[in-house]
Amino acid sequence: MGDYIVKATAYEDNVLAFAALSKDTVNRAKEIHSLTPTACAALGRSLTAVAMMRTMMKGEKDKVTLVIKGDGPIGSIVVVSNFPGIVKGYVGNPFVDLPLSEKGKLDVGRAVGKKGYVTVIKDIGLKEPYIGTVEIQTGEIGDDIAYYFYTSEQIPSAVGLGVLVGKEGDVLTAGGFILQLLPDVKEEVILKLEKAIGQITSVTDLLRQGKTPEDILTSIFEEEEVKFLEKIPLKYECDCSQERFESAILALGKEEIQKLIKEEQGIETVCHFCGKKYFITRERLEELLKEAEN
């Protein structure tokens, strides 16, 4: 079974729900970045969350970026989704290795840190993107994204994210859910949802049991009718290219390109998201300079 996201409603369309299975997606990220288990859990949770957040957006060309910058040893976490069901990301320190937490879990909160900021950038094709920034709450990522939704978008939300890493470092399972109250919801629905969320042990436990995204939502809402609206395949994929790299060089302007021509025989860069290397020769830099001058 491949990775995918489901979108649904519950409580007579008063709650919007998303759930994802992201095992292969997270495993691909682990392979690309040589992630330790702790770094894998941190990036995996973030990838899963952003994949669901992109599903909330309506435009085909809409983009969402999540940046988590805490004071922990993992450094920054950056995840981008430019298309529905396609994500990419990286962490500042993929080799961070910490002891298990007091609960015997991978200590993502300590890796991320308790001080810092969560920033969400949504580009829906307007002149300026929407940028929302909130303080990190726990560093566990799920709590922090729920706090972002409530504080920055005024949407009460519950976010559950999980990544289970085996003893050999392989990703055994990964996934999560996001539940959001729609406007003007009745108090009784809020109480029902709070009770349902309170009964969830952990997303990882549900995934370990082999629950699908549909199963996860059905188990959360129990006897309530869940209307499944959409199913979207999910994968890790980078859309970098030589053209994009050259466009970034052009954006530097004439003076900077002239400096590069004087100081370098050529430029090599590595994509943060997939590790692919790109090279621009001195001759190509001179061509780009002519374009910049025109």
Curated annotation (Swiss-Prot):
It comes from the Bacteria. Under oxidizing conditions two disulfide bonds are formed involving the reactive cysteines. Under reducing conditions zinc is bound to the reactive cysteines and the protein is inactive. Keywords: Chaperone, Cytoplasm, Disulfide bond, Redox-active center, Zinc. Pfam families: HSP33. One of its GO terms (biological process) is protein refolding. GO terms for molecular function: protein folding chaperone; unfolded protein binding. One of its GO terms (cellular component) is cytoplasm. Disulfide bonds join C238-C240, C271-C274. The keyword Cytoplasm applies. It is found in: Cytoplasm. Its main location: cytoplasm. Belongs to the HSP33 family. Redox regulated molecular chaperone. Protects both thermally unfolding and oxidatively damaged proteins from irreversible aggregation. Plays an important role in the bacterial defense system toward oxidative stress. This is 33 kDa chaperonin. It comes from Caldanaerobacter subterraneus subsp. tengcongensis (strain DSM 15242 / JCM 11007 / NBRC 100824 / MB4) (Thermoanaerobacter tengcongensis). The gene is hslO.
